[in-house]
Amino acid sequence: MTAPLSSKESSAELFFLYDTHCPWSYVTTQLVNEIHKAFPQITLHLWHAAFFDGSSTIKASELSEVERLAETSFSKNYQDTIKKNVDSTLSANLMTWAQNKAPNFALPLLNSIQKSHFELGNQLTTKTSFDTIIDELKLSPPAKVFKSDKLSKDASIQLEEIFALQEIINTEAIPALLLAIDDQLVLLNHNYYLIQPEAIIEAVQLELNQHLK
């Protein structure tokens, strides 16, 4: 049982730098889910890095490495799509809108997008490909979110914030999980917890105990 956060601890924040279409981000989202479930008072910042712009593909060797380290397997629906160029622009726009305008729905939305992409094999490059997700979550994003040719203004601004944070932690690698407690910034090594996501709860609690004495 995790101890509830005190009023002082409620200032803790979790930053998740990711791409919805990145397989490493997909398996790391389960850690974010565990942390949010155990520490609902920690403010979540789900920052989409918009890494995939339609100019690259996912390598089969990379998928194999993710499967090995996370002890998971990707659906045939998804694996049948990996030779296609990957474009997460619309997902970046939608996730940024949700983070800014409907933050309580941001994590459920992220999970739904990743399920659609990695389990059902949907590329999510058109507005209609998001219809089921949006209807299920009862969201009302503006039309500008679904301009597939470029990132929205808000997504571009968020990218600048991501770049600034990456300079601080001295890495551009995604995914990245960062716990901010007052003026302390802790980079959580997500690779340690992919097989046992619940184990990250103890790691977060240790950091809270250390920095909030």
Predicted segment positions?
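Structural alpha/beta surface segment adjacent to cysteine/selenocysteine redox centers
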Residues: 26-121
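A short beta-strand-turn-helix
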Residues: 1-12, 159
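Short active-site neighborhood of thiol/selenol oxidoreductases, capturing the structured segment around
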Residues: 8-23, 28-32, 44-45
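Generic signal for short, ordered secondary-structure residues
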Residues: 11-14, 77, 92, 145
